[in-house]
Structures are given as structure tokens and as C-alpha cells.
């Protein structure tokens, strides 16, 4: 992961939040458990979405345990409340993948996700040519389409930067 990009991104998020932590899957999992916040992040903790019937234990969640979701994890907090969890990956030299983005359940629909994505895009313009996402359910697909992302294939959407 591009360290300069991550440092810039964390600095930008820091203007909006009390604390921004970046690190590993283990660090995110530990903080979610420590603050007893797992119930507010069902996709990341339990692999559960509105379109799925999955409900695994946090120790089995591929997001927090599997190698497919290695990358840089970022967590935004206000006081002791986690606001969002984000996983970013490099996909080659010019593509950023937003591997996972989950907003605290009761804060969804208030524009927070759009603001987070806008910050990611504005910082990413300096380092990447495009952003790729692979939404996990239809709500996420609709969100990314509203954010201007276009279907690249059957499972991922992309947005060109610097056009």
C-alpha cells in the first residue's frame, strides 16, 4: 500500500473524527471486540448483509481472518464509538481497491458513506488513476452506482480519477 497515500488519507479523516486508526486485520478485530462494537458492523464481523443469510462467528469472518482481505485497514472513531471500518488495497501501480467499507449501522443513509468516499477519491487522485469496488449486496451496488461508479464486469465497479 502506498504509505504517502495512507498518511494523507488518515490526516484528512482526522479533521472529521476524534481518532483514526490504521493497521491490520488483527488490530481492527481487537478494537471491535474491545469496544463491543461488532453488532454495529455485521458485514465485517459476521459476513452478514441484507442479501445474505450468513452469520458466522467473528473468529471465522473472512474479512477479519482471511488472506483475501489483507490490505490497509482504517477505522474512524468518535470517542469510544466506531463510525466506519475501511479496507484498502493496491491493485497494480495505478488502481486502488476499496475492498471493504462499512458504516456503523445506525448512521447509514445520512451521507456519511458518500463523504468518506469523496475524501478517499480526492486524496487518491494524487496517487491512482482509478478506484475499483466489489459490492457485497444490492444496497452497496446502488450506493456505488450513485457515487458514479460504473460496472466493469459482473462483480466489480470502477471510477476513473483525473478525467
Language model features with spans:
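Short amphipathic alpha-helix that is part of the acyltransferase structural core
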Residues: 1-65
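A short helix-loop-beta-strand connector motif used in the catalytic cores of GNAT acetyltransferases and
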Residues: 62-74, 97
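GNAT/GCN5-related N-acetyltransferase fold signature
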Residues: 76, 88-89, 103
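Glycine-rich phosphate/pyrophosphate-binding loop shared by adenosine-nucleotide-utilizing enzymes
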Residues: 79-85, 96
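Conserved acetyl-CoA binding element of GNAT-fold acetyltransferases
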Residues: 94-105
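Conserved acetyl-CoA-binding loop-helix of GNAT-fold acetyltransferases
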Residues: 103, 109-122
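Conserved GNAT acetyl-CoA-binding A-motif
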Residues: 124-136
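Conserved catalytic-core motifs of GNAT/GCN5-like acyltransferases
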Residues: 134, 145, 150-163
Amino acid at each position: 500500500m502506498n504509505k504517502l497515500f495512507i498518511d494523507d488519507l488518515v490526516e484528512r479523516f482526522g479533521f472529521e473524527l476524534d481518532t483514526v486508526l490504521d493497521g491490520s486485520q488483527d488490530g481492527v478485530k481487537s478494537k471491535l471486540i474491545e469496544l463491543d462494537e461488532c453488532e454495529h458492523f455485521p458485514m465485517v464481523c459476521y459476513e452478514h448483509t441484507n442479501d445474505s443469510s450468513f452469520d458466522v462467528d467473528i473468529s471465522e469472518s473472512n474479512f477479519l481472518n482471511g488472506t483475501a482481505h489483507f490490505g490497509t485497514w482504517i477505522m474512524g472513531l468518535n470517542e469510544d464509538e466506531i463510525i466506519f471500518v475501511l479496507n484498502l488495497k493496491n491493485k497494480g501501480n495505478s488502481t486502488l481497491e476499496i475492498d471493504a467499507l462499512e458504516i456503523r449501522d445506525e448512521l447509514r443513509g445520512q451521507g456519511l458513506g458518500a463523504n468518506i468516499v469523496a475524501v478517499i477519491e480526492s486524496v487518491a487522485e494524487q496517487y491512482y488513476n482509478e478506484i475499483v469496488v466489489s459490492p457485497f449486496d444490492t444496497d452497496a451496488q446502488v450506493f456505488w452506482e450513485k457515487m458514479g461508479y460504473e460496472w466493469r464486469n459482473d462483480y466489480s465497479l470502477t471510477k476513473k480519477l483525473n478525467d
